[in-house]
């Protein structure tokens, strides 16, 4: 995959908001930006892939990406991606690593307004960015990070788990297939991901569930597809990580889609995948 690296840009270009429409499964090249920025999927679901692993954000979450952090986006479903670059003084209030944060109703409206088609003065835009930061920093960081292991045996296990998610195997049986003992794999998972294998697999299942539910798959069918023995176990695990039940999550996505639709797409949107976030902003500048 080609890599696009963005050199530092003048402040007036860096602090411009962007809107991009990505088709299902469309991906941007790996790239980085000179300023930290927030990425909000007003519709659809967005994955953030980095050397540290992946994060996933539906339309009731917002992603923070620090300055200089190499990353790639992947859209799940037709995704309306809004990008808001932050001045260093505001970026300092956010984590030094990528993070998924709760998108509050106030922050959502400020983001949609800031990235909307109506031109705003520099003062208004500055105040809107401050509103977003003030609001999203009141909630804790969301545990939606899936660490990426680097050991070849763990990578082989990950591939097997992803391929057979609806029929999960024990770590011992997975180890037999990749030529490693259960004890070795268990130790490696803890060392490389900071999680036990069951914790990591639950995180992976919830990531997959977020995508299926966003695609209007039923709760029962999602539970089965992701390998849970019964819907109750799925609902408990999902609620623990996401902070709402699968049904509440689906309802909130529908409401967010209506809100984003009423606000419009905010002007010209990049749809290609050749550079950076996949296109130019309203002024023709590549972000």
Task: Show where each model-derived region lies.
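Ligand-binding loop in jelly-roll beta-barrel domains
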Residues: 69-91, 96-98
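DNA-binding recognition helix and immediately preceding turn/loop
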Residues: 148-199, 215-226
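Amphipathic alpha-helical segments enriched in hydrophobic/aromatic residues interleaved with Lys/Arg
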Residues: 91-162
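Generic protein-terminus/edge-of-domain signal
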Residues: 1-45, 285-286
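Basic, amphipathic alpha-helical hairpins
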Residues: 114-120, 136-142, 157-170, 189, ...
């Amino acid at each position: 995959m080609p890599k696009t690296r963005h050199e530092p840009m003048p402040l007036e270009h860096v602090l411009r908001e962007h809107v991009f429409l990505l088709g299902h499964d469309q991906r941007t090249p790996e790239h980085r930006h000179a300023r930290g920025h927030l990425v909000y999927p007003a519709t659809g679901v967005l994955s953030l892939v980095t050397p540290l692993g992946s994060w996933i954000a539906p339309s009731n979450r917002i992603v923070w990406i620090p300055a200089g952090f190499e990353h790639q986006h992947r859209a799940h479903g037709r995704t309306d991606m809004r990008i808001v670059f932050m001045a260093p003084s505001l970026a300092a209030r956010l984590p030094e690593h990528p993070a998924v944060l709760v998108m509050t109703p106030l922050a959502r409206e400020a983001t949609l307004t800031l990235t909307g088609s109506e031109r705003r003065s520099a003062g208004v835009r500055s105040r809107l960015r401050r509103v977003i930061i003030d609001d999203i920093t009141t909630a804790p960081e969301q545990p939606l990070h899936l660490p990426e292991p680097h050991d070849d045996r763990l990578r082989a296990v990950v591939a097997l788990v992803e391929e057979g998610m609806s029929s999960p195997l024990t770590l011992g049986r997975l180890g037999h297939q990749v030529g490693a003992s259960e004890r070795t794999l268990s130790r490696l998972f803890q060392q490389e991901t900071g999680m036990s294998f069951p914790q990591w697999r639950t995180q992976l299942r919830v990531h997959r569930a977020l995508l299926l539910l966003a695609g209007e798959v039923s709760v029962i069918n999602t539970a089965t597809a992701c390998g849970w023995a019964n819907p109750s176990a799925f609902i408990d695990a999902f609620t623990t990580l996401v902070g709402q039940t699968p049904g509440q999550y689906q309802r909130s996505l529908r409401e967010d889609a209506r809100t984003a639709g009423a606000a419009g797409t905010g002007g010209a949107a990049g749809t290609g995948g050749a550079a950076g976030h996949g296109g130019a902003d309203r002024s023709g500048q590549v972000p």
